[in-house]
Amino acid sequence: MRVSASVKKICRNCKIIRRKGVVRVICTDPRHKQRQG
């Protein structure tokens, strides 16, 4: 899980999702998981 100020899609499987006001990236590749914090 990478925590960064700006989250971007890395590959075409990445999806940007808002959960409880937190922007997240979920992907089939676990290294692409990100959270905006």
From Swiss-Prot:
<dbReference type="GO" id="GO:0003735">
    <property type="term" value="F:structural constituent of ribosome"/>
</dbReference>
<dbReference type="GO" id="GO:0006412">
    <property type="term" value="P:translation"/>
</dbReference>
<dbReference type="InterPro" id="IPR000473">
    <property type="entry name" value="Ribosomal_bL36"/>
</dbReference>
<protein>
    <recommendedName>
        <fullName>Large ribosomal subunit protein bL36</fullName>
    </recommendedName>
</protein>
<dbReference type="GO" id="GO:1990904">
    <property type="term" value="C:ribonucleoprotein complex"/>
</dbReference>
<dbReference type="GO" id="GO:0005737">
    <property type="term" value="C:cytoplasm"/>
</dbReference>
<comment type="similarity">
    <text>Belongs to the bacterial ribosomal protein bL36 family.</text>
</comment>
<keyword id="KW-0687">Ribonucleoprotein</keyword>
<dbReference type="GO" id="GO:0005840">
    <property type="term" value="C:ribosome"/>
</dbReference>
<dbReference type="Pfam" id="PF00444">
    <property type="entry name" value="Ribosomal_L36"/>
</dbReference>
<dbReference type="InterPro" id="IPR035977">
    <property type="entry name" value="Ribosomal_bL36_sp"/>
</dbReference>
<keyword id="KW-0689">Ribosomal protein</keyword>
